[in-house]
Design a protein with these regions (language model features):
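Short alpha-helix in the alpha/beta-hydrolase fold that links the catalytic acid
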Residues: 90, 104-113
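Hydrophobic "lid"/C-terminal helical patch
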Residues: 37, 72, 111, 138, ...
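Catalytic active-site module of serine/aspartate enzymes centered on a nucleophile-bearing elbow/loop
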Residues: 116-148
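A conserved short beta-strand
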Residues: 1-7, 11
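Conserved alpha/beta-hydrolase catalytic His-Asp/Glu region
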Residues: 10-16, 28-87
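Active-site loop/turn elements of alpha/beta-hydrolase fold enzymes
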Residues: 5, 75, 125
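Glycosyltransferase donor-binding loop in the core domain
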Residues: 25, 60, 100-103, 127-130
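Short beta-strand/loop motif that positions the catalytic acidic residue
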Residues: 88, 94-96, 100
């Protein structure tokens, strides 16, 4: 299963945004990174969900600056993997929050279209952190897919 992801390499704009966040973290302001990212990570209606926001911020804090920097650098170097998707032969579920700003649904539609027989599920009223925002819907999609 592929959740809230894309197969393309970063655009120059995405790389610039990542570099800006890396600079912020390197200046000792890592705790400021996650609050800046929140509107990109979750559906805007969930920004007022204090428990969800606290859980996301705690998760980011526990992952820490070093892992964040490694992740951002790896993503910036990621190659376009679309050419290889047609070779995937295993059952594949592609899931995306319909309001995912970081990896918009069109990227999931693209992936599902390139993987033979892939199933696509778009979760309504959901952003990038679909497993945290809509766990019941994600679990149902995974359960349905695994029992088919």
């Amino acid at each position: 299963a592929l959740l809230d992801t894309g197969a393309r390499a970063d655009t120059p704009e995405q790389t610039t945004r990542r570099r800006d966040l890396i600079k912020l973290a390197d200046r000792g302001e890592f705790k400021a990174v996650s609050p800046k990212l929140l509107p990109l990570l979750i559906h805007l209606d969930r920004l007022s969900d204090a428990m969800l926001v606290a859980e996301i911020l705690a998760m980011a804090d526990s992952v820490g600056k070093d892992a964040f920097l490694r992740q951002q650098n790896a993503i910036m170097r990621r190659a376009d993997s679309r050419p290889g998707l047609s070779a995937i032969e295993c059952p594949t579920l592609v899931v995306c929050g319909r309001e995912d700003v970081l990896t918009p649904p069109d990227l999931s539609v693209e992936i599902a279209g390139l993987i033979p027989g892939a199933e696509l599920v778009l979760v309504e009223d959901c952003g990038h952190l679909s497993t945290m925002e809509c766990p019941e819907e994600i679990n149902a999609a995974l359960r349905n897919w695994m029992t088919c």
